[in-house]
Amino acid sequence: APEIFKKIANAEKGLVLVTGPTGSGKSTTLAAIVDYINRNHNKHILTIEDPIEFVHNNNKCLINQREVHRDTHSFQNALRSALREDPDVILVGEMRDKETISLALTAAETGHLVFGTLHTSSAAKTIDRIIDVFPGSDKDMVRSMLSESLRSVIAQKLLKRNGGGRIACHEIMTATPAIRNLIREDKVAQMYSIIQTGAAHGMQTMEQNARQLMAQGMVSREEVDSKIGL
């Protein structure tokens, strides 16, 4: 996994979104990040999942995993009670609705490191999706909250690996001051070019990552053309 993933996992607070279509390996990426935190930090981690896919054992961290419908009625209820238990890290699973997104933003703003997933295919579309969930009168406030609490968006697709298996191709956006500004000012369309030139901040576009994977002989040109298109 890219070095930037460690930096994301080492963060004290903020919102980290892992996005992509169903079956793109989002929960595998999140499980790897939780595992890294568990091995390197003394923290309290609370996960809210539907269903629980990876079972984590306490290593350095205390981990509570809750399953929606079995342990709790909904993501919102679970998230509300989670905030009362004051975990350091909260994994929300899917951020489907306004209430869950609002709670996740509030949690990220109040000093928790929050991980969530969406089905969007890029960082820009992820920002738009979150803002779109809210009515017009709330959009500016949500933009402002998001610009302050967002830490990173990791969008991914799975590609067929040469020689068998699959490999994830990532777009990575980190919330630099320039990115935060674009979110606040509703100029998300300009985000792609900042990601493209943001390698120093650990950023990369899906296309840049696909080219690296091709150069390393991991994936074929045909596979990249059909899944990503260069």
Residue ranges of predicted features:
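Short, flexible helix-loop junctions that flank or precede catalytic/ligand sites
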Residues: 1-230
